[in-house]
Amino acid sequence: MEFWGIEVKSGKPVTVTPEEGILIHVSQASLGECKNKKGEFVPLHVKVGNQNLVLGTLSTENIPQLFCDLVFDKEFELSHTWGKGSVYFVGYKTPNIEPQGYSEEEEEEEEEVPAGNAAKAVAKPKAKPAEVKPAVDDEEDESDSDGMDEDDSDGEDSEEEEPTPKKPASSKKRANETTPKAPVSAKKAKVAVTPQKTDEKKKGGKAANQSPKSASQVSCGSCKKTFNSGNALESHNKAKHAAAK
């Protein structure tokens, strides 16, 4: 850092050209010696390129100086409208240190980049690399999924076993089946028994009827065949033996 200062006389603007790689910081402007203090106002002007700006206004009575913070890296011009004295501008000079890894060429390249490419360049850093989970997490996920499958299978088994409460109804049926039926009345028992007796009688009657038939069998004298009735024997004799005679 190096002190810098300049005197600007009445009606004589001063042009200041910073050295290459140097910045000029203007921090204060003040009026010179003034014999007549009647509250006269003194505007201060600064011109940079084609722009002529008012830096501030001093007063011989109330505002003999003002503080500012202006930095110039190229040629500029200072002036004022006070015709009774000089105005002094002071400040300091510092080297124009550019950030490391950054130059004017890079700045020009960035300005030439199209807006679309700039948007892509901005969008790319947003993409985050996919996080790789450790194998332990995979095993835990598998165990969790197995646990879920077991829970699902248990849920299905429980759902399949839910219809079992219907068993009490079947037990009631079994209870009804096992319970002894009401005793059958004597009349019904007799009615149920009598058909058996009649069947036995029928069977017995047939057997009795068959025995006389077997006793009344007749045999043919010529061929010694037996017949159950005489009519059968007669028809046999007519058919067999009468034709032979």
Curated annotation (Swiss-Prot):
InterPro entries in UniProt: NPL, Znf_C2H2_type
Residue ranges with Polar residues bias: 208-234
Zinc finger map (C2H2-type): 218-241
Phenotype when changing residue 25 to A: Decrease of transcriptional repression activity
Region feature Disordered, mapped onto this chain: 99-245
Record PTM N-acetylmethionine, positions in chain: 1
GO CC terms, sorted: nucleolus
Biased composition (Acidic residues): 103-113, 137-162
UniProt KW keywords: Acetylation, Chromatin regulator, Developmental protein, Hydrolase, Metal-binding, Nucleus, Phosphoprotein, Repressor, Transcription, Transcription regulation, Zinc, Zinc-finger
UniProt superkingdom: Eukaryota
Region annotated Required to repress transcription, chain positions: 2-5, 101-162
GO molecular function terms attached to this record: histone deacetylase activity; hydrolase activity; zinc ion binding
Composition bias, Low complexity: 114-124, 178-195
Pfam families membership: NPL
PROSITE patterns: ZINC_FINGER_C2H2_1 (PS00028), ZINC_FINGER_C2H2_2 (PS50157)
Expression sites by tissue: Expressed in leaves, roots, stems, young plantlets, flowers and siliques. Highest levels in ovules, embryos, shoot apical meristems and first leaves. Also expressed in somatic embryos.
Residues that bear Phosphoserine: 211
Localization per record: Nucleus, Nucleolus
Entry's family note: Belongs to the histone deacetylase HD2 family.
Function: Probably mediates the deacetylation of lysine residues on the N-terminal part of the core histones (H2A, H2B, H3 and H4). Histone deacetylation gives a tag for epigenetic repression and plays an important role in transcriptional regulation, cell cycle progression and developmental events. Required for histone H3 'Lys-9' deacetylation. Involved in rRNA gene silencing in nucleolar dominance. Seems to be implicated in the regulation of genes involved in seeds development.
Something else known: Loss-of-function mutant (antisense inhibition) induces increased methylation of histone H3 'Lys-4' and hypomethylation of DNA at rDNA repeats.
Subunit architecture: Interacts with DNMT2. Interacts with DEK3.
Listed name of the protein: Histone deacetylase HDT1
